[in-house]
């Protein structure tokens, strides 16, 4: 630091800047006189301290990476745990058709609102498209065709829908589990009848709202 402050001009630098060449001692005396004149209140000891000051190199500091926070575990039960606890099962004392008639009335009103009123001049294609994406819990559903003859004619209120089956309660208070595969179902509301081909309907209720169904002329079981 001292060598930098008291660095004397070379012959070339002195000539370029048109200054008189000074030796190291004369340069040091000039700097001391300049400081004393510029900062008269500073003591001689402080001046010496500033002139002798050296740069301090600090150690390299490595920033510690933050520790990853543990993921919060879901407080709710998983779908597997719900199945193991049989939370989706309908108790035998609750398997009564009359208990679910209010649900059916709510469903009919829901469909009427969804279709902006089921009027005689309403296009059947529009109703069909709405029903394919609608929530069917509470609908009266019937099996009209099936490769298993025992399923044909079964009618009841839809209580549960999974990816592969419909669970319906009949008027005789029997809970029936009907597979969608190889079955054709009908849903009737206000004289409109909609057909559902179960083999093409193997989706969860939550997935159907985003599904694009294509119209086809004939579909085999």
Curated annotation (Swiss-Prot):
Keywords, ordered alphabetically: Nucleus, Phosphoprotein, tRNA processing
Cellular component terms per the entry's GO annotation: multimeric ribonuclease P complex; nucleolus; ribonuclease MRP complex; ribonuclease P complex
Domain of life: Eukaryota
Chief location category: nucleus
One GO-annotated biological process of the protein: rRNA processing
Subcellular location: Nucleus, Nucleolus
SUPFAM superfamilies in the record: Rof/RNase P subunit-like
Phosphoserine modifications at: 10
GO molecular function, one term: ribonuclease P activity
Keyword Nucleus: yes
Role description: Component of ribonuclease P, a ribonucleoprotein complex that generates mature tRNA molecules by cleaving their 5'-ends.
SUBUNIT field: Component of nuclear RNase P and RNase MRP ribonucleoproteins. RNase P consists of a catalytic RNA moiety and 10 different protein chains; POP1, POP4, POP5, POP7, RPP14, RPP21, RPP25, RPP30, RPP38 and RPP40. Within the RNase P complex, POP1, POP7 and RPP25 form the 'finger' subcomplex, POP5, RPP14, RPP40 and homodimeric RPP30 form the 'palm' subcomplex, and RPP21, POP4 and RPP38 form the 'wrist' subcomplex. All subunits of the RNase P complex interact with the catalytic RNA. Several subunits of RNase P are also part of the RNase MRP complex.
PANTHER family, A to Z: RIBONUCLEASE P PROTEIN SUBUNIT P29, RIBONUCLEASE P SUBUNIT P29
Protein family per UniProt: Belongs to the eukaryotic/archaeal RNase P protein component 1 family.
Name the record gives this protein: Ribonuclease P protein subunit p29
Protein species of origin: Rattus norvegicus (Rat)
Phylogenetic lineage: Eukaryota, Metazoa, Chordata, Craniata, Vertebrata
